[in-house]
Amino acid sequence: MDEQPRLMHSHAGVGMAGHPGLSQHLQDGAGGTEGEGGRKQDIGDILQQIMTITDQSLDEAQARKHALNCHRMKPALFNVLCEIKEKTVLSIRGAQEEEPTDPQLMRLDNMLLAEGVAGPEKGGGSAAAAAAAAASGGAGSDNSVEHSDYRAKLSQIRQIYHTELEKYEQACNEFTTHVMNLLREQSRTRPISPKEIERMVSIIHRKFSSIQMQLKQSTCEAVMILRSRFLDARRKRRNFNKQATEILNEYFYSHLSNPYPSEEAKEELAKKCGITVSQVSNWFGNKRIRYKKNIGKFQEEANIYAAKTAVTATNVSAHGSQANSPSTPNSAGSSSSFNMSNSGDLFMSVQSLNGDSYQGAQVGANVQSQVDTLRHVISQTGGYSDGLAASQMYSPQGISANGGWQDATTPSSVTSPTEGPGSVHSDTSN
């Protein structure tokens, strides 16, 4: 409707005066009694009515539009407008090829389908939650609670996405329908081809597609933030408690020459730490890899655990010596038998300190002095009973001559006091 006044102003004189069909209509309408002034007056009234349509109310506009469509000069006016359009080629374009789908929009659609946000709801959020659970690992009630929270949050994101997408589609359809109806209505007065209507619809959809892309992009960002938060939280919760870490580190550094626990040792460690055997195996595998990659960094930690083991063994030895020699507590040459309540733990400590288990670790000077003190205390106690090997907690392993790992023999060299003081030996170096 905006083009009508401009077109009529620019081409009224030429088109309407020079058009033969329109002249014939004017002559027929005016009759023989009316002159040139009457025809100009009639044309001026039509143009004035067209100019004032935009300023009228809806009811008045509908009445004027109906009067215009029923006017006897309406066909002549339409023919003039068609000729003007053909001459000036206004809004005439060839059939445009269908534009390819935006690759960014395709990536967003694929991501939303993979995360279970788009597409059918059945199994979508559950599948995404199961994938997140498999990636994070772990088990237990805490893990199930986290998965429930993840599914709830994902379902909320999905609901918001579909609600906004429905609003978007509804607004796009309503606006497209309104424009198409408006163009069809205007096509009764001015020439508008169906191809031009289709082109206008494609322009509207292209404008709305930017809104759709923004909605999908924000939804994908929300899903990624949700996944990162839950995966990070699960990764933090997978850390063992301090007591379990201490137990595993003590065993690792006391068997540093061969940190490969047997199945029995793994089961015992799993019971002590309150974890599964597979978690114990995974922990030792990761610990060996980290230790090999950065030996210098873990050397200080190894020295700390070695000193702690030495102090514990010294206290146990002194306590056992006093318990077995109550009449002569200060006797240094006592050859009485020395029995321990926890001989397996002490043997593990003595084996590590008196043998070759730490020869590759370069124990510090302060730790070496504690080792010498421990050996002196052992020489004062006289010896150990032969039942020590039977109560051994872990199976020590050694390195064979060809460089492979093998089980060490039972430490039969732990003998009675008949061999003399300080006769404790370790067989882990075979």
From Swiss-Prot:
The keyword Signal does not apply. One of its GO terms (cellular component) is nucleoplasm. Keywords: Activator, Chromosomal rearrangement, Developmental protein, Differentiation, Disease variant, DNA-binding, Homeobox, Nucleus, Proto-oncogene, Repressor, Sexual differentiation, Steroidogenesis, Transcription, Transcription regulation. The keyword Cytoplasm does not apply. CDD domains: homeodomain. It is found in: Nucleus. Its main location: nucleus. Residues 407-418 have a biased composition (Polar residues). InterPro entries: HD, Homeobox_CS, Homeodomain-like_sf, KN_HD, PBX_PBC_dom, TALE_homeobox. Residues 323-338 have a biased composition (Low complexity). Belongs to the TALE/PBX homeobox family. Forms a heterodimer with MEIS1 which binds DNA. The PBX1-MEIS1 heterodimer binds a cAMP-responsive sequence in CYP17. It also binds a consensus region in the SOX3 promoter. PBX1 forms heterotrimers with MEIS1 and a number of HOX proteins including HOXA9, HOXD4, HOXD9 and HOXD10. Forms heterodimers with HOXA1, HOXA5, HOXB7 and HOXB8 which bind the 5'-TGATTGAT-3' consensus sequence. Also forms heterodimers with HOXA5, HOXB7, HOXB8, HOXC8 and HOXD4 which bind the 5'-ATCAATCAA-3' consensus sequence. Interacts with PBXIP1. Interacts with TLX1. Interacts with FOXC1. Interacts with MN1. This is Pre-B-cell leukemia transcription factor 1. The gene is PBX1.
